[in-house]
C-alpha cells in the first residue's frame, strides 16, 4: 500500500495495527479477565485462540508491532479495542465479524421493540355496502397485524340520524369479525355529534 499507511475504515472499533497502546487490559473469549498485558502478548493470545482481539479503550501512544501484527494477520485473527478511554485501553480476543453481526442484530431487535403504535382510522356509514365493507375490513386486519390500533368512525348524514341502531349494528359486526385479532379499547354508548367511534387494539401475541 502506498506509503505503508493502513486504509481507514468505518469500523466502530480499532483492531490490530490501529490500536494505539503499549499495554492493554485483556478480556478472553468467555469474558474472563486476563489482566494487563503488552499488546504483543494480547495478539499472541488471540492467535492461539484463532479469533480476533478487539480494543475497547484506546488512549496511548502508537507503537510498532509489525512482526506480531503480521503473525496475527496470517492466522486470520484480530485484536479489537472495545473501550478506547480506559487506562490502560481494554481489548478483547474475539471473532470480530460475529461481534459486529450480533451488535447489528441486537440493534434491530431494539428498534422492533421501540415500534411506535399508531392509530389508523377507517370510516364507515350505516349504508356501507357489502363489497366496501369487506375492503375496509381487510384494511383493519392489516393495521392490527402490523401492531397498530384501529379507529372505526361511523358517520351519519341527513336522515341516517334516524337509524342510529343500524350504525350500532355495523360497529358490532366489525367487532365480531375482528375478535380473533383485536380487543375493544373503547365502544360508543351513544352518538356524539353525527358520529360513533370505536377503537380496537391488537391482541398481544402469546
From Swiss-Prot:
Compartments where located: Cytoplasm
Protein biosynthesis is among the record's keywords: yes
Chief location bin: cytoplasm
Keyword Cytoplasm: yes
Gene Ontology biological-process entries: ribosome disassembly
Superkingdom of this protein's organism: Bacteria
PROSITE patterns listed in its UniProt record: IF3
Record's keyword terms, sorted: Cytoplasm, Initiation factor, Protein biosynthesis
Gene Ontology terms, MF aspect: ribosome binding; translation initiation factor activity
Oligomer status and interactors: Monomer.
Described purpose of this protein according to its UniProt entry: IF-3 binds to the 30S ribosomal subunit and shifts the equilibrium between 70S ribosomes and their 50S and 30S subunits in favor of the free subunits, thus enhancing the availability of 30S subunits on which protein synthesis initiation begins.
Protein name: Translation initiation factor IF-3
